[in-house]
Structures are given as structure tokens and as C-alpha cells.
Amino acid sequence: MIFAHDTEAALVSAAALVNTGGRDEEGLPNLIALDQFFRAHGWTGRREHDEAELRSVRALRPRLRRIWEVGEDEVVEIVNALLRESNALPQLVSHDGWPYHLHATPPDAPLATRMAVEAAMAFVDVVRTGELRRLRVCEYPNCGNVVVDLSKNRSKRFCEAGCGNRAAVSAYRARRAQS
């Protein structure tokens, strides 16, 4: 484990959220998709289950995506802004069978606020440990998805959308064509 469990979960969730704003189709087209995302990433707390909530979660994606695209100083600016705007107050909590971990918003805060702050708190750990190079963009041509590399040797190059398999098949075909 590179980071604490809650940090890794928040990083993976942030990347998954960013990747729902894909170039080809909307990954959160409706409230059902948001509900599925909420459950898949273990989110807890208040939900409005309305279009305004969906819009606010979608609006968070470009701000988070910038973190994968900029240098450390600008990452710090984005993270600090997310924490400041949400009046984040870090506290140790234990719930749903999880050991103590940090939350910086109350469980009744709006979902997009909780997502923003959880991501920001995770990025704090990434910056503090000098591990920003673990945040990458998928190397597969024309993909553009973001990647959180939690491998021990920082070797993850592709996103979770099958790009690694496509790259391996392309390399295999190229080798076969040369022989």
C-alpha cells in the first residue's frame, strides 16, 4: 500500500469520476449512473437524487482533471481552493466497519462537496509525499483517461478501459508483421 486506504480509495474514485467525462460519451448520463457510481466507490452520506446533484458532480470533473495536467504549484492551488471553498475541517471518523480515517466534511454535506473534499484530501497526501508522478494520463493513443498508479514500482501506463490489452495486441501484431 502506497498511501493510507482512504487516500487510495479517494484517488481511485477521483480518477473514475474524471473518466466519466470521457471524450466520446457521457459516463454519468443520468441519476441511475450516478447511483451506480456512488455505490461502486463506497460513498456514504446524504443524497439528493436530483438533476442538480448530478450537474454539480459533473461540474467537479474538469477541476479534478486539471490536477493530472498541471505541475505541483498549480495542483496545490487547486487543492487549497477545493478545501477552502468547502470549509473543510479534517476529523478522524470510523463508520461502516472501516477503521479510523479522515473526513473533512459532515455526512450531510452535498455529494459534490464531499467528493471534492475527499479528492482534495487525497491529493494533499500525494503532494506531501512527493508522488505526483503517480498521476498520469493513459498512454494509449487518443484515450485521454486519467490514471492513478498505485503500483509499487510506478509502472502503470494505461487506464482501466482496456487500453493495456489493446496496446499489447497492437504490439503483438506489429511484431508479427515484421516477421
Across the structure, where does each feature detected by a protein language model lie?
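Cys/His-rich zinc-coordinating "finger/knuckle" motifs
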Residues: 145, 150, 166, 170
